[in-house]
Amino acid sequence: MKEFLTAATSSTGGASLVGAATGQLYIAGATFICFLLFGAWGAYWKYRDSKAIQEALNDGDLNKALKIRGR
């Protein structure tokens, strides 16, 4: 425990703050990229279902359109 306290207090406060902020920025960036990927994936599936519903309605198959919508 003594070694930990010595190491923790021997570094400058500014360096530890910058290191913590850099780590948080990496995590925030990775999270943002994940949000973008999942958003694009969801938009693709919504577009795909919308096209399938439109085709079913054009063919006059209301049951198929409702089944796709209910997914």
UniProtKB/Swiss-Prot annotation:
The chain crosses the membrane at residues 25-45. It comes from the Viruses. Keywords: Cytolysis, Host cell inner membrane, Host cell lysis by virus, Host cell membrane, Host membrane, Membrane, Signal-anchor, Transmembrane, Transmembrane helix, Viral release from host cell. Its main location: host cell. Residues 46-71 are periplasmic. It is found in: Host cell inner membrane. Signal peptide: none annotated. One of its GO terms (biological process) is killing of cells of another organism. Residues 1-24 are cytoplasmic. It is a single-pass type II membrane protein. GO terms for cellular component: host cell plasma membrane; membrane. Homomultimer. Accumulates harmlessly in the cytoplasmic membrane until it reaches a critical concentration that triggers the formation of nanometer-scale pores (pinholes) causing host cell membrane depolarization and endolysin refolding and release into the periplasmic space. Once the pinholin has permeabilized the host cell membrane, the SAR-endolysin is released into the periplasm and breaks down the peptidoglycan layer. Determines the precise timing of host cell lysis. This is Holin.
